[in-house]
Amino acid sequence: MNNTLVYIHSHACDHLRGLANREDVIRFINQLESNPEIIGDYRQPDPRGRMIEVKLLGRQAILFFRDPYANIVKILDIRNVEAG
């Protein structure tokens, strides 16, 4: 079985590099590579109609979508989230 290509947008990659505890995020990215069918904790369509998935990992939210025709998952953003 071929792994899916996971593309990480440059500003998401910059945020990932700055994280002190990035192991959970990297583990999730690796899971997306081997299983692109993973869905997030929340989802919402963007203006183009793509379903944007939001996965919460501790204090981080990963925004991504799957393009099944290109066999790619694009990570659009990694954001800090605060409990509140």
Q: What are these regions, as identified by a protein language model?
A:
Residues 19-22, 35, 66:
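Low-complexity, intrinsically disordered/propeptide-like segments
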Residues 30-56:
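A short, surface-exposed loop/turn module that caps and links secondary-structure elements
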Residues 25, 45, 76-77:
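A generic "cationic amphipathic patch" detector
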Residues 9, 30, 44, 66-67:
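Intrinsically disordered, low-complexity regions enriched in small/polar residues
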Residues 1-30:
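Arg/Lys-rich, positively charged N-terminal/basic patches that mediate binding to nucleic acids
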Residues 15, 36, 50, 72-74:
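Amphipathic alpha-helical interaction segments
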Residues 1-7, 54-84:
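Enriched for short, Lys/Arg-rich terminal
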